[in-house]
Regions:
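Extended, small-residue-rich solenoid/repeat segments and analogous flexible loops
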Residues: 1-36, 40, 187-189, 193-195
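Flexible, glycine/small-residue-enriched loop-and-beta-strand segment within the central core
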Residues: 4-5, 27-37, 42-133, 164, ...
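Short-chain dehydrogenase/reductase
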Residues: 22, 83, 126, 132, ...
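Flexible glycine-rich beta->alpha loop in the catalytic core of nucleotide-sugar glycosyltransferases
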Residues: 88, 95-96, 138, 149-150, ...
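Beta-rich strand-turn-strand
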Residues: 119-120, 130-143, 149-152
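Short arginine-rich
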Residues: 153-158, 188
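Conserved beta-strand-loop-alpha-helix hinge in the C-terminal portion
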Residues: 157-159, 165-181
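Crotonase-superfamily enoyl-CoA hydratase/isomerase domain that binds
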Residues: 182-186
Length: 195
């Protein structure tokens, strides 16, 4: 994977970024001044990051796999240790499909009924391949979303959700919280700030 160097990341004009940020040069980045990236973040080939007014914020230790899309005018925020499997789509904007308005971005705003709402992913959230997350959703800490799920409602902490629409099907173990503590203790002396 061909990734941006630190100098190239600076030249992109990101709002800020931390250490060990690996973004594929094959990713598409729109409105980089509205994108903030923490430490230890990897964004793979063919991802689309289209930051609207709310921006996109990545915490630390985050992976965004190939072909993911983060799109919309609302904020999209990732907590530490969260990640997306391939082909996940997160939308913070949505057209009105009722027929009352015209749809698509080529139409002037006064003829559309686009709505915008923030999407928030807590710490340790993982979303399976091909899942779709709609505007206004909050995935609390530790949530797992199964592959090909459609998430239109908030998901409670450490729940495992699957389906279209996504429903809670189980409880996730919390052992990873202790592992997080151990990792943070190990990396404290060398942890750096944002660029």
């Amino acid at each position: 994977m061909s990734i941006y160097s630190t100098e190239e990341l600076r030249a992109l004009g990101l709002a800020d970024f931390g250490e060990d940020v690996r973004i594929s040069k094959k990713a598409s980045i729109y409105n980089p001044s509205r994108i903030s990236i923490g430490n230890h973040v990897r964004i793979d080939d063919f991802c689309v990051l289209s930051a609207g007014e709310g921006g996109i914020e990545f915490g630390d230790y985050i992976h965004i796999a190939v072909y993911c899309s983060l799109i919309g005018a609302g904020k999209i925020k990732f907590g530490d240790f969260s990640g997306l499997s391939s082909r996940v789509s997160i939308y913070s904007s949505n057209d009105d499909y009722s027929g009352v308005h015209l749809t698509n971005p080529t139409i002037p705003d006064q003829f559309t009924g686009v709505t915008h709402a923030d999407v928030l992913l807590g710490k340790h959230v993982i979303i399976g391949a091909g899942a779709v997350v709609l505007p206004g959703v909050c995935l609390e800490d530790g949530v797992v979303i199964g592959s090909l799920s459609l998430v239109s409602k908030n998901c409670a902490a450490f729940g495992i959700y699957s389906g279209a629409p996504a429903r809670r099907i189980g409880e996730r173990k919390r052992d990873l919280l202790e592992l997080e503590k151990q990792l943070r203790q190990q990396s404290m002396p060398s942890s750096g700030g944002k660029q």
